[in-house]
């Protein structure tokens, strides 16, 4: 019996439920529904705009404390001039670089996402992680791959 995309999505749904990763389970469930409903336009939309839409929602969520006044001007100045704040700036710059590397890797080899999902599930189960960064995971994988190239 050939392995179909429906079977893979069902397996990811099951693994997501068993691993208590509601995000992975929900994503697999939604994609399985779209696939079974033959709503191919949704796949096109998600491929073209899904990442931007997801990042927009993430940024909106992160920026809410700025918008609702929970972060003061004093907090902002402190975080731009303190060691933790400067390290956060450095971390943000490094993360965006790694994210771009991860995006390039996923565009060059879309099948790599399966490994990233499995790695995310392992991270949830064994490291208490949260699967919010497939781009970061891909970026770290790209960094590992570059390191591996140089050590050969």
UniProtKB/Swiss-Prot annotation:
It holds the Pfam family DUF441. Keywords: Cell membrane, Membrane, Transmembrane, Transmembrane helix. The chain crosses the membrane at residues 14-34, 51-71, 76-96, 112-132. Disulfide bonds: none annotated. Its main location: membrane. It is a multi-pass membrane protein. One of its GO terms (cellular component) is plasma membrane. The keyword Membrane applies. The keyword DNA damage does not apply. It is found in: Cell membrane. Belongs to the UPF0756 family. PANTHER family: UPF0756 MEMBRANE PROTEIN YEAL. This is UPF0756 membrane protein Daud_1310. The lineage of its organism: Bacteria, Bacillati, Bacillota, Clostridia, Thermoanaerobacterales.
